[in-house]
A protein has these predicted regions:
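A conserved FAD-binding loop/helix module that cradles the flavin
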Residues: 165-167, 295-337, 341-344
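FAD-binding core/adjacent interface of flavoenzyme oxidoreductases
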Residues: 2-6, 73-172, 176-185, 251
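Beta1-alpha1 glycine-rich phosphate/pyrophosphate-binding loop at the start
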Residues: 2-75, 161-203
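Short, electropositive alpha-helical surface patch
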Residues: 161-178, 207-212, 307-316, 344-354
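A Rossmann-like FAD-binding core segment of flavoenzymes
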Residues: 30-34, 71-91, 102, 178-276, ...
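Short glycine-rich anion-binding loops that position phosphate/pyrophosphate groups of nucleotides
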Residues: 16, 112-115, 256-258
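FAD-site-proximal beta/loop scaffold in flavoenzymes
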Residues: 124-147, 237, 244-249, 253-313
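C-terminal auxiliary extensions adjacent to catalytic cores
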Residues: 347-385
């Protein structure tokens, strides 16, 4: 289909990037693949929610990609992306020794986003759980060492791009910590608080899901403070537009924006700071340059996610369009917009599914918890074996 001289460069080594590698090989594209990332490990972030309870450790959710890269004949370049130039054909990479220039024929950008830290006191007085396994372990250790007190959990968004939010995991941390404390016989010593600036938190999951999540909080005796924007986080409290909420431990998932290196480029940007893409995951105005996952801003429904499963779907579409281009055809594959989420609580889960045809929410049951664990094992098998 293509010559072996075709060089496909992938920036990042997360969900979207690795799915792109697999799809390229699955479609038998005869191309050299170079992956650029700071390390050759995958952290399975969806399972971070099990770290506070000890159901998962950092080692459990870490995958060494050395064998995967060797099997898929991938050249891995350890480094940080500094710049992308020449409409995607040139990438500047900062390695341990120097900044090098790497050229390509096709580029896939999948470096992820970064959490906004503009909320005063966030960096000093709160933990952003999904920043990595070290934060998951920190949450575990902090709660283990507490004899009681108030744990407050909430999330925010990017006001210029409301889709750039990680609400689902915060519901899982909330319910999971509640379950853990009950299993430990310590729940009566703790006050759990959920706070959010919206009066309908988690709207991306659908109205029925929001109702169900709020109902679950009330059932679990979780104090709900919604509809007032957080103004700052202090050492012992959250200050909102309406009130002050005392807290001994704060977990807060802020909204996301694009990675810092984008500021060095001429890549088209959305108002929220992401790379502007079309429905085929093409970077607008940059030929043979694609973006998948959290780094991009895409057309689609207001509930469109960008991470994990959706990043996989975008990577599949991007590679299908690359195959078209290399064969001299017009790219014809739009990415599928689909949201699948199991809101887990350590021993049970609530299933949420959305696409352009339907929105489905199924009540909590043990089957969904085990389904989430099965999917974790199935997903990681491709990279561990």
């Amino acid at each position: 289909m293509t010559t072996s001289k075709t060089h496909i460069m992938i920036l990042g080594s997360g969900f979207g990037a690795l799915t792109a590698v697999r799809e390229i090989r699955k479609k038998k594209v005869r191309a050299r693949i170079t992956v650029v990332s700071p390390n050759n490990h995958l952290t399975y972030l969806p399972s971070l929610i099990w770290m506070p309870s000890g159901l998962r450790s950092a080692a459990d959710i870490d995958v060494d990609l050395t064998k995967f890269f060797a099997r898929e004949q991938v050249d891995w370049l350890k480094g940080q992306v500094v710049n992308v130039r020449d409409e995607g054909r040139t990438v500047d990479v900062e390695t341990d020794r120097e900044t090098i220039v790497v050229t390509n024929d096709v580029l896939i950008i999948a470096t992820g986003g970064r959490y906004l830290k503009k909320l005063p006191g966030l960096a000093e007085h709160a933990i952003i759980p999904c920043e990595g396994a070290t934060k998951g372990q920190l949450i575990h250790d902090r709660i283990r060492d507490m004899e009681g007190g108030t744990i407050a959990m909430g999330f925010g968004t990017n006001p210029k791009e409301p889709q750039a939010v990680r609400g689902g995991p915060m519901f899982e941390f909330l319910f999971g910590i509640d379950t853990m404390l009950r299993q430990q016989g310590r729940r009566d010593k703790f006050r759990l608080v959920f706070f959010n600036g919206s009066d309908r938190p988690g709207q991306r999951l659908g109205p029925k899901a929001v109702d169900g999540l709020l109902r679950e909080m009330w059932k679990r005796d979780i104090s709900v403070h919604i509809g007032a924007k957080p103004l700052r986080i202090e050492a012992d409290r959250i200050v909102t537009e309406r009130e002050e909420i005392p807290a001994d431990l704060v977990l807060f998932m802020s909204g996301l924006t694009g990675p810092l290196w984008l500021d060095n480029t001429d890549l088209p940007r959305s108002s929220g700071g992401f790379i502007q893409a079309d429905e085929k995951c093409r970077v607008v105005g940059w030929p043979k340059t694609y973006v998948v996952g959290d780094t991009g801003s895409y057309p689609g429904p207001e509930w469109l996610a960008k991470q994990a499963h959706q990043a996989d779907l975008q990577a599949e579409a991007a590679v299908a369009n690359i195959v078209d281009e290399l064969a001299g055809r017009e790219p014809s594959h739009n990415f599928k917009a689909e949201l699948i989420c199991i809101v887990d609580s350590v021993n049970k889960g609530i299933l949420v599914f959305r696409n352009h045809k339907m929105a489905l929410t199924l009540p909590k049951c043990r089957v969904f918890h085990w389904a989430k664990r099965f999917f974790e094992r199935h997903y990681l098998k491709a990279y561990r074996n």
